[in-house]
From Swiss-Prot:
GO molecular function: unfolded protein binding
One protein family per Pfam: SecB
Highest taxon listed in the record's lineage: Bacteria
NCBIfam families per record: PRK05751.1-5, secB
Keyword presence, Transport: yes
GO biological-process terms attached to the record: protein folding; protein tetramerization; protein transport
Family assignment from sequence similarity: Belongs to the SecB family.
UniProt KW keywords: Chaperone, Cytoplasm, Protein transport, Translocation, Transport
Subunit architecture: Homotetramer, a dimer of dimers. One homotetramer interacts with 1 SecA dimer.
Function comment: One of the proteins required for the normal export of preproteins out of the cell cytoplasm. It is a molecular chaperone that binds to a subset of precursor proteins, maintaining them in a translocation-competent state. It also specifically binds to its receptor SecA.
Compartment(s) where it occurs, according to its Swiss-Prot or TrEMBL record: Cytoplasm
Source species: Neisseria meningitidis serogroup C / serotype 2a (strain ATCC 700532 / DSM 15464 / FAM18)
Listed name of the protein: Protein-export protein SecB
Keyword Transport found: yes
Length: 147
């Protein structure tokens, strides 16, 4: 009787790969009044490191502008993780890398953005959760349509 191998999904390491903050109009920008327009962009990526090990990145870029022209700040964070995935079917591996891993990483990226912006002298930026499953489904549909 053969023993079935159990699937393995584990977090091996979480780390900040890149963190940058620019306040191009300091110190004058702190004297200006008004509600900033905040724009957030999120991207994900993954790469296989070696058998069963993958690196996943979630990059969050937040730009705040006054009157849609003067940049208050530009903050970019790449939160990364090394994940171990073994004995998992390939289609499930892609789902884990595109949905589960980014869901694990995003709260860390969100905290890094909020903390960095606050330490720069601005009010905290509260980023809404991201539906990585919907993004993954859209990417799958776009790839299927292009094939």
């Amino acid at each position: 009787m053969s023993e079935e191998l159990q699937p393995v999904f584990s977090i091996e390491r979480l780390y900040v790969k890149d963190l940058s903050l620019e306040v191009p109009h300091a110190p004058q920008i702190f004297l200006e009044q008004g509600e900033p327009e905040v724009d957030m962009r999120v991207s994900t990526g993954s790469q296989k490191l070696e058998d069963g090990y993958y690196n996943v990145d979630v990059t969050v870029t937040v730009t705040a502008k006054l009157d849609n022209e003067r940049t208050m700040f530009l903050n970019e964070v790449t939160q990364s993780g090394i994940f171990r995935l073994e004995n998992i079917p390939e289609e499930d591996v892609q789902l884990l890398l595109g949905v589960a891993c980014p869901n694990i990483l995003f709260p860390y990226a969100r905290e890094a953005v909020s903390g960095t912006v606050t330490r720069a002298g601005f009010p905290p930026v509260l980023l809404a959760p991201i539906n990585f499953e919907a993004i993954y489904q859209q990417q799958q549909e776009a790839e299927a349509a292009g094939a």
